[in-house]
Regions:
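Intrinsically disordered, low-complexity segments enriched in small/polar residues
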Residues: 1, 8-10, 42-45, 97, ...
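RNase H catalytic domain
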Residues: 19-23, 62-151
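RNase H-like nuclease fold core
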Residues: 2-55, 66-68
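Short, conserved alpha-helix that lines the donor NDP-sugar binding/gating region
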Residues: 57, 61
Length: 152
């Protein structure tokens, strides 16, 4: 299901993206954290080294959940309803239990996310088309461009 328009059922939305230039290649994550009341909006883009696109996608979700927990505190996190938005259909289907995970490294990320998820009231994963995830994608590309410029 890909429902681009939704009523606010969640306290926070975490838009995530991970990307690599080459697969594997130089990689980065982009994360946008927003509260439903508009009081919180944080943007992050970080270079994460040489890895695969799928690995970067998972690292973005892990980063986003950890960062949100840090921002709002453990007690508030325990009651918070979180929507994680990704343009990776593979990631969304794996996290929602529709696709098996073969790669051992991705299995480790899945387990880390499973353990992080229990720190929140509810975590839901939703796929959106790439054009609806431009902010997180922009953060990925900015981090990759910054790293590339360091090397020149």
């Amino acid at each position: 299901m890909n429902n681009e328009k939704r009523t606010t059922l969640y306290d926070f939305t975490i838009q995530t993206d991970g990307g690599s230039r080459g697969n594997p290649g130089p990689s980065a994550i982009g994360v946008i954290i927003k509260s439903s009341d508009g009081g919180l909006r944080k943007e992050y883009g970080e270079y994460i080294g040489i890895t695969t696109n799928n690995d970067a996608e998972y690292q973005a979700v892990i980063f986003g959940l950890k960062k949100l927990k840090h921002l709002i505190g453990k007690e508030k996190a325990g009651h918070a309803r979180i929507e994680v938005v990704t343009d990776s259909e593979l990631l969304e289907r794996q996290l929602n239990g529709h696709f098996k995970i073969q790669d051992p490294k991705i299995q480790q990320h899945f387990m880390e996310l499973w353990n992080l998820k229990v720190d929140f009231g509810d975590v839901a994963y939703r796929h959106v088309y790439r054009e609806n995830n431009k902010d997180a994608d922009r953060m990925v590309n900015a981090a990759l461009d910054k790293e590339t410029n360091k090397l020149l």
